[in-house]
Structures are given as structure tokens and as C-alpha cells.
């Protein structure tokens, strides 16, 4: 009887052997580590913080990301999507945070102004989460397919920058950097193609490790940070001072929070498509609550920034086929450990950017491919769906291809449309309402088309996800 129950359990709720979960969890961390630490480094540098305080922001970001990931994957009451979603500091908030911080004079004063705005935005987002649930019918396949595709497209320039050695660096585009990225990608492809079972599923992790080893003899790996890093550090509440609450900063951050919630909704729907468990309204609300609660705690206590689901890890789930949320929970534990033990974080930080770029090409491209697969299910015959897809993708790609296109527009407009993801989502929703209205055949989200063949529906799984 116990064996039958185990066989019926949805892959999302399966607990794998401990060794496998650690390896798969580490692979998730290594694929998103650079994205997590980039935000505090950018903001901290702009605020003029010394190296020690920059390192403090970095460990705080890792700690917050880990706690948020645990909240999202395991869930508490009605909080958490209970999906294999990795949480991390959100790039969507960077521009607004820089404006808020510089407006407050930079330094610690700038950070406290940012934290005050983050706290209020998180609370507002938490209260608005059920409204997003009621708006779920606005995300039929033609909309979610567009958004998922643009998520992948918007992430690809990040991997391009990494592959070149880091955008803005003196040696950007050096053939040696590009060759290293190419070697890493070829290693991943070779492992994925020729090695069986478990080995093919850790192709990304193996590619990162082997790519780093290849880079070492050529002086591309800097291990000095490992010796300099502390063994243990804890992020104490209000390290930079009590939060400051300014109306203009709060309004700006609330707008950003709405953008982040839109992106997180798309990620929840995307991972639902990948894992074969349709994302219903309860799942979306739980995921948004986890996002916004973690953001509130991040700004209020842990010296962190807004968090959101990381789309690149959706691609990793698609590549590996490992759908267990407990694997991603292990990722959260690893992130917490990295946040408490900076020396461990310094080891991962030693991975050269070109190596990350090579792996990112496979990861981010897979996200875009998932969106294209979703769009292949849309009915284009006798409908206006083709023009909806065309214009929405164009609006999403516009700020990616021309980052300064909206520089003369008001700041609130830039906050929304400088994000290709939110621009594509808003355009697709409005055009779908214009051409398709809210008729029944356009209401179901992409993941609601029916369970993947061979997958046991959630409600039929003994011991499956709770109703919380």
C-alpha cells in the first residue's frame, strides 16, 4: 500500500535521496548565484558603500533569498506556491532603488530610504495578492505564452554579457572569454547528449565545475576572495539604521512591486506548465504572498531588497526534468548557509563570468523555448491571436533591443515599460481583451489546458499538497 502511494505521488511532491537532492539543489544555486549578488553589488556601489558593507549586503541578499525560497517551496498556511521556484533579489527594482537612494543622499541614508519603501510596497503587495487571483482569467494561453517567451528572451542578454566577460569591463568581448563560454556550453551539450540518467541531469552543474577547471590554468579564476572571506557572519536587523518612509519613494516602489507581482505570476504559470501541475488561483495567490511577505521581511529586518521568482531556474527544471519542490527547498538551505558563511559563498563567486554565460545560454534559451511550445497550442485559425502575439512580443523586445527608447518618458512610465516582461504582459492582456474579450475559451490560463499525460492530478494524490 505504501509503495502504491509513493508511485501515485506527483513528481513535485517526491522526496529524492539526500545525495541527489543536495547535488540538484547546488545546481540551482550555481545557476542563479550571480543574479542574486548582482543587485546588492550594483546598489551598494551606487550608494558609495565601502567593500566591507558591500560584502554585508551580499550576504544579506543570499540569506533573504534562501529564506524566501523555503517559504515558497514548503509553504506556511496559505503562503507559498509549493512549487519548485527559487527566489532571489529582483532586478526589476534596481532602477527605482537607485533613484530613491541617490535622492536621499546615498550611503546609509539612501539605504534606509530604500528599505522604508520596500517595507510598504511588500505590505501593499501582500494585501493585493487575492486581486491578482481574480485577474487570473486575463492570462489565457495566448497571453502566458507570449510572457514566457519574452522572459526567456529578456534573460538572454544577461548570458551574453557574462559570456563576453562582463558588460562594461575592459576585456569585454575578448575571444578568450567567448571561447571559454563556448567550451562550457559544449561540455553541457555533450553531457546532456551522451551521458545517461543522473549524469545528464546535472549537466549544468558539471559544465560550471568543468568550465571553471578549464579556465584555471589561463588565469581566469580568482581564488583570492576565498581566503579573504569570513567564516561566519549574521545579518542583524536595521544594520544601516531604522527605515525611513518617504511618500515619493513609497509610490515608486509600490509600482515596482506590481511589476514584480506580474512577473512572478508569469513564473508561477510557467513552472506549472513545466512540471505538469496546472497553477490554479490558490497557487498564484500563495506564491504572491510568499514573494511579498519575504520582500517585507527583507526590507524590514534583514537589510535586503525585493525578491521574486527566478525565471532561469524554471529553465533548469525544464532541462533536468527534476520537478521536486524539496530539491529547490534544499537550494534554499544552501543559500541560507551561503548567507551565514561568506567563505562558502566566495567559492561559488569564483566561477568566471564566461563560464556562467555559457551555461546561461542553455538555461535562458530553454525558458524561451517553453514559451514557444506554449504558443504552439494557441488557435490561430479565424482568430486575431496572431496579431496579439506579434505586437506583444514586439513590445516586450523593444526595451531589450533599445534600452534608452523610453528615457524621455515620465519615471512611472519607464518603471513599467522598461521591463520587457511587464510591457509584453500588459500589451498581451489589453490586446486579448480587445480582440477576444473574456469569452470562456479564452479564460483558462496556459496551465489549465489539462494535466500532462501520465501525471496524477493533485487532488488524487494521497499526501499531496495541502489545501493551505
Please place each PLM-identified region on the residue numbering.
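Intrinsically disordered, low-complexity non-transmembrane regions of multi-pass membrane transporters
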Residues: 1-24, 223-238, 273-277, 434-468
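N-terminal signal-anchor module of multipass membrane proteins
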Residues: 2-85, 92-104
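Juxtamembrane interface elements at the cytosolic ends of transmembrane helices
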Residues: 3-6, 36-40, 44, 184-194, ...
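Membrane-embedded helical hairpins/re-entrant loop segments and their flanking transmembrane helices
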Residues: 18, 44-82, 252-325
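Hydrophobic, membrane-embedded alpha-helices of multi-pass small-molecule transporters
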Residues: 19-36, 173-185, 203, 216-218, ...
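Generic transmembrane alpha-helix signature in multi-pass membrane proteins
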Residues: 40-44, 94-106, 133, 157-164, ...
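Short, non-helical or kinked segments that cap or interrupt transmembrane helices
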Residues: 56, 78-92, 137-146, 199-205, ...
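Membrane-embedded alpha-helical modules
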Residues: 102-221, 331-445
Amino acid at each position: 500500500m505504501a509503495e502504491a502511494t509513493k508511485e501515485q505521488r506527483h513528481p513535485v511532491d517526491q522526496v529524492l535521496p539526500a545525495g541527489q537532492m543536495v547535488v540538484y539543489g547546488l545546481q540551482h544555486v550555481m545557476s542563479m548565484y550571480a543574479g542574486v549578488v548582482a543587485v546588492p553589488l550594483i546598489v551598494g556601489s551606487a550608494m558609495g558603500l565601502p567593500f566591507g558593507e558591500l560584502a554585508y549586503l551580499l550576504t544579506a541578499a543570499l540569506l533573504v533569498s534562501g529564506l524566501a525560497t523555503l517559504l515558497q517551496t514548503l509553504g506556511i498556511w496559505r503562503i507559498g506556491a509549493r512549487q519548485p521556484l527559487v527566489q532571489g533579489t529582483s532586478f526589476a527594482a534596481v532602477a527605482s532603488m537607485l533613484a530613491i537612494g541617490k535622492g536621499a543622499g546615498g550611503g546609509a541614508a539612501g539605504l534606509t530610504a530604500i528599505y522604508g519603501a520596500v517595507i510598504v510596497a511588500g505590505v501593499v503587495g501582500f494585501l493585493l495578492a487575492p486581486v491578482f487571483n481574480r485577474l487570473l482569467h486575463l492570462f489565457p494561453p495566448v497571453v502566458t505564452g507570449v510572457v514566457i517567451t519574452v522572459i526567456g528572451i529578456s534573460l538572454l542578454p544577461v548570458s551574453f554579457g557574462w559570456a563576453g566577460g562582463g558588460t562594461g569591463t575592459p576585456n569585454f568581448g575578448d575571444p578568450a572569454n567567448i571561447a571559454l563560454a563556448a567550451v562550457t556550453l559544449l561540455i553541457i551539450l555533450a553531457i546532456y547528449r551522451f551521458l545517461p540518467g543522473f549524469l545528464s541531469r546535472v549537466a549544468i552543474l558539471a559544465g560550471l565545475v568543468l568550465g571553471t577547471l578549464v579556465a584555471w590554468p589561463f588565469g581566469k579564476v580568482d581564488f583570492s576572495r576565498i581566503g579573504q572571506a569570513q567564516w561566519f557572519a549574521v545579518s542583524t536587523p536595521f544594520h544601516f539604521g531604522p527605515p525611513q518612509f518617504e511618500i515619493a519613494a513609497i509610490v515608486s516602489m509600490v509600482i515596482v512591486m506590481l511589476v514584480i507581482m506580474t512577473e512572478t505570476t508569469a513564473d508561477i504559470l510557467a513552472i506549472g506548465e513545466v512540471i505538469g501541475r496546472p497553477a490554479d488561483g490558490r497557487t498564484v495567490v500563495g506564491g504572491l504572498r510568499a514573494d511579498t511577505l519575504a520582500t517585507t521581511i527583507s526590507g524590514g529586518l534583514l537589510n535586503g531588497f525585493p525578491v521574486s521568482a527566478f525565471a532561469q531556474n524554471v529553465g533548469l527544471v525544464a532541462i533536468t526534468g527534476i520537478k521536486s519542490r524539496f530539491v529547490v527547498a534544499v537550494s534554499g538551505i544552501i543559500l541560507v548557509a551561503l548567507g551565514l558563511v561568506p567563505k562558502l559563498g566566495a567559492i561559488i563567486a569564483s566561477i568566471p563570468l564566461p563560464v556562467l554565460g555559457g551555461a546561461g545560454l542553455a538555461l535562458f534559451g530553454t525558458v524561451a523555448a517553453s514559451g514557444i511550445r506554449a504558443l504552439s497550442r494557441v488557435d490561430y485559425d479565424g482568430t486575431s491571436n496572431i496579431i496579439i502575439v506579434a505586437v506583444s512580443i514586439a513590445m516586450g523586445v523593444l526595451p531589450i533591443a533599445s534600452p534608452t527608447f523610453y528615457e524621455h518618458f515620465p519615471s512611472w512610465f519607464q518603471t513599467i515599460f522598461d521591463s520587457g516582461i511587464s510591457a509584453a504582459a500588459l500589451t498581451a492582456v489589453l490586446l486579448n481583451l480587445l480582440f477576444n474579450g473574456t469569452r470562456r475559451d479564452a479564460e483558462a490560463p496556459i496551465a489549465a489546458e489539462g494535466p500532462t499525460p501520465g501525471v496524477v492530478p493533485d487532488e488524487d494524490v494521497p499526501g499531496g499538497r495541502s489545501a493551505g
